[in-house]
């Protein structure tokens, strides 16, 4: 069987004072606190959310 492709996203900056839709994107990816890392499926939806908040996350993979 093939493994589903994933990528890691780490929240590097605070969500305080950010736009509501950017906070929603971070929460949608499962990010909660600064330096919290999650591994999500590499889908267009997840890539779009990560790209929307590129300035406050680190993307690996």
Curated annotation (Swiss-Prot):
It holds the Pfam family Ribosomal_L30. SUPFAM superfamilies: Ribosomal protein L30p/L7e. Keywords: Ribonucleoprotein, Ribosomal protein. The keyword Glycoprotein does not apply. Disulfide bonds: none annotated. InterPro entries: Ribo_uL30_ferredoxin-like_sf (IPR036919), Ribosomal_uL30_bac-type (IPR005996), Ribosomal_uL30_ferredoxin-like (IPR016082). One of its GO terms (biological process) is translation. GO terms for molecular function: structural constituent of ribosome. CDD domains: Ribosomal_L30. One of its GO terms (cellular component) is cytosolic large ribosomal subunit. Part of the 50S ribosomal subunit. Belongs to the universal ribosomal protein uL30 family. This is Large ribosomal subunit protein uL30. It comes from Francisella philomiragia subsp. philomiragia (strain ATCC 25017 / CCUG 19701 / FSC 153 / O#319-036). The gene is rpmD.
């Amino acid at each position: 069987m093939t493994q589903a492709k994933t990528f890691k996203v780490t929240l590097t900056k605070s969500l305080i004072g950010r736009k509501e839709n950017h906070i929603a994107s971070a929460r949608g990816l499962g990010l909660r606190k600064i330096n919290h890392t999650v591994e999500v499926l590499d889908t267009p939806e997840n890539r779009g959310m990560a790209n929307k908040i590129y300035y406050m996350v680190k993307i690996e993979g």
